[in-house]
UniProtKB/Swiss-Prot annotation:
Described purpose of this protein according to its UniProt entry: Usually encoded in the trnK tRNA gene intron. Probably assists in splicing its own and other chloroplast group II introns.
Keywords carried by this UniProt record: Chloroplast, mRNA processing, Plastid, RNA-binding, tRNA processing
Organism: Solanum tuberosum (Potato)
Gene Ontology molecular function terms on file: RNA binding
Protein name: Maturase K
BP GO terms, sorted: mRNA processing; RNA splicing; tRNA processing
Cellular component aspect of the GO annotation: chloroplast
Amino acid sequence: MEEIHRYLQPDSSQQHNFLYPLIFQEYIYALAQDHGLNRNRSILLENSGYNNKLSFLIVKRLITRMYQQNHFIISTNDSNKNPFLGCNKSLYSQMISEGFACIVEIPFSIRLISSLSSFEGKKIFKSHNLRSIHSTFPFLEDNFAHLNYVLDILIPYPVHLEILVQTLRYWVKDASSLHLLRFFLHEYCNLNSLITSKKPGYSFSKKNQRFFFFLYNSYVYECESTFVFLRNQSSHLRSTSFGALLERIYFYGKIERLVEVFAKDFQVTLWLFKDPFMHYVRYEGKSILASKGTFPLMNKWKFYLVNFWQCHFSMYFHTGRIHINQLSNHSRDFMGYLSSVRLNHSMVRSQMLENSFLINNPIKKFETLVPIIPLIGSLAKAHFCTVLGHPISKPVWSDLSDSDIIDRFGRICRNLFHYYSGSSKKKTLYRIKYILRLSCARTLARKHKSTVRTFLKRSGSELLEEFLTSEEQVLSLTFPRASSSLWGVYRSRIWYLDIFCINDLANYQ
């Protein structure tokens, strides 16, 4: 990586913009395949008949064959003679695209490292902690309770492959690399094989996921550059002058710079964007733009976003993909939680001289609840219970050993408790635990051809211990006779920084 960093160091000739020569470096494909820098294990050298000195020729030959369509038709006899020539067309594309994805990520990684290093001495989160899904919720807790309206935005998906190429045009100025990228994309018959939108989020084909995720994230970055567009005062958006986008760190700085620029040149439109309470969050294929402003202000933002995306990406964007909702009157599905802003009334008794009276203090509070009905639906779909929530046995697992069955059920229960540890009300989670525990008991009883009651008498409390969550285990070991106040700590919200994906059962959409 140090060698790559030295190669991409900026100089007077701006040679760091030319990434195409790196495609012919063999260690790039070792990095792409997570094989480290061991040349002997690279995917390009796992074929017999090739040595370490021919990496340049191998990659060049691969690219040549990708362009020569007639060379992809290889007879069985030829493939037996030379296993490397027996690779099919998709393998050629996959090998090169994986290396290409690794290469184009390098400038972004270096830019990200330099951006984070500029914050030395300041209190910021580590970058790997920012990847956690739960790192978003404390931000919402602190800020959303004071806001009024929110724009629920379904990020538009690119309807044409050329949009993805144009998105990278401002980051990668190497024409050869862009031509190769365009060829990769046109290897696919249509966009449906690359990105599908059956769910609110986006799903990618299993092949070359790293490559497609990079393209999609670059495209989303361009969509989010709407705010930067105002600062540039131009219809031609160039994102190269800004660091890597980590919306939880840099968004407020961008808003401050926007206000500073518009205070000089655009006094008339300044009131539209000068909102210190504007907050932005992106998750899955959606984003949220919340503000303390009024409904007309949010409506202006809505039509501005629609017009900008239509003009910049040359595509039709339906206004129905953006909804304006009032936080106090609307509950939204947010990454497996039901989130809302509720008014909690706090009664305070005040006494003045001989007179006493009650004061009602309404306090807004951001709540996160467990969506019990959809979650039970997910359990029913996985055959743990009926649609009404009645536990049933899992016949598919009855051939496993008792320890494996208990471990699987216990792991699912602990994962759900781990993910929903930030819920405001955790009583519904105990219903989920009851369903999984009884389903486990019925599965074991079915295996041993006995009744549930007989099996529970024989197993004792061992089955219960497998379903204890990590928080309950700590409390039970540290405080064997924990008081109600200690269990109140467990009932409070707990956010973890090690959750990088939504549990399959929690992702019920």
